Amino acid sequence: MGWGWILLFAAGCAEIIFALSLKLNEGFTRLWPSIVTMISGGGSFYLLMMAIKTLPLGTAYAVWTGMGAVGVAVLGIFLFKESADWWRLASISLIVLGIVGLKLTDIE
């Protein structure tokens, strides 16, 4: 796995933190969650920008958004008691399958 994929993974993690902190900052009325939102959002975009220097743009963007969607959906189930019905879990599984498929197309 090259640096591009490592940076993309870090960007995806920062994206998950960004999205979760959006919920916690309550419209930017809470200081620390608001600071985390700004830092993680900026960091996520910066890391994505660095990753697309070596990865195909379409692949990198799809993986980044997919990671964010899956991470937030799964953590939403555990942290915010969001629905975990079988349709939602099946949909999350399809996103994961798509991410794996995109990674497999970039084998060096």
Across the structure, where does each feature detected by a protein language model lie?
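Polytopic alpha-helical membrane proteins, predominantly small-molecule transporters/carriers
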Residues: 1-108
